[in-house]
Amino acid sequence: MSRKILIAGNWKMNPAPLSAQATPKQAPETYLPIDTVDTAIFPTFLDITKCIDAGIITGGQSGHPEESGAHTGDVSMKMLKEIGCKYVLCGHSERRQDHYETNEFVSAQVSSAIENDLMPILCV
């Protein structure tokens, strides 16, 4: 069994127009056989359910390793899974810089993602 290539797009803190939601389904067929490619979008948290409802494989831009608690502004891995995400970014350089995320925190993110049946995308 060979691995599929993952083509993913991170929207960062930029909402995309509805027309962009069709792009992930169309782009891989243009360049690669569709059976060799998986696609995913990492939209803003507010756009995740719109993308999922449009049939797009979706991931969270980050996830907190704890299930709940006093973590203002964070979203847990469990929450991401419950709304339908398949992937989550862990250790993105912007999160490490802007939010002072350490290697230990990123390791906890990866473990929590796996425990919650999300596929972690570890940024190095």
Protein language model regions, located:
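Active-site loop-to-helix "anion-binding N-cap" substructures in soluble metabolic enzymes
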Residues: 1-124
